[in-house]
Amino acid sequence: MTLNLSVLTPNRIVWDSEVEEIVLSTNSGQIGILPNHAPIATAVDIGILRIRLNDQWLTMALMGGFARIGNNEITVLVNDAEKGSDINPQEAQQTLEIAEANVKKAEGRRQKIEANLALRRARTRVEASNPIS
């Protein structure tokens, strides 16, 4: 049995196919979704979406949004998403280092909040670019 997973951003469809299982980062922690999961709607946090397909795990960096699960259909609407295989690990690491430096030099509440969000996004991209063993 499979699940139909759709990952959508405002600009494009990132994923639209059947999967065996997913692990989704929500605002209240990670949840695993298998076929025949109870229907839910949840907020999606900045984090990794893990997808099991053909007994292999794939990753995707999600940048916050919402998910709806029901009748073996999963729709994930996010601000942005990138498949782990599409992320250049060196570029992601450089972005992380810049984000860490920006957090240290941020002044004022707004700058600190924006710098910390950029740091979370950068960490997520680095994590997604590393294959799951």
Curated annotation (Swiss-Prot):
Gene Ontology cellular component list: chloroplast thylakoid membrane; proton-transporting ATP synthase complex
Any Pfam family the entry gives: ATP-synt_DE
UniProt keyword list: ATP synthesis, CF(1), Chloroplast, Hydrogen ion transport, Ion transport, Membrane, Plastid, Thylakoid, Transport
Major localization listed first in the record, in broad terms: plastid
Domain of life of the native organism: Eukaryota
GO molecular function: ATP binding; proton-transporting ATP synthase activity, rotational mechanism
Coiled-coil portions: none
Tagged with keyword Lipid biosynthesis: no
GO BP, sorted A to Z: proton motive force-driven ATP synthesis
UniProt keyword Membrane present: yes
Record localization: Plastid, Chloroplast thylakoid membrane
Signal peptide location: none
Membrane topology value: Peripheral membrane protein
Quaternary structure and partners: F-type ATPases have 2 components, CF(1) - the catalytic core - and CF(0) - the membrane proton channel. CF(1) has five subunits: alpha(3), beta(3), gamma(1), delta(1), epsilon(1). CF(0) has three main subunits: a, b and c.
Similarity remark: Belongs to the ATPase epsilon chain family.
Purpose of the protein: Produces ATP from ADP in the presence of a proton gradient across the membrane.
Name assigned to this protein: ATP synthase epsilon chain, chloroplastic
Lineage: Eukaryota, Viridiplantae, Streptophyta, Embryophyta, Tracheophyta
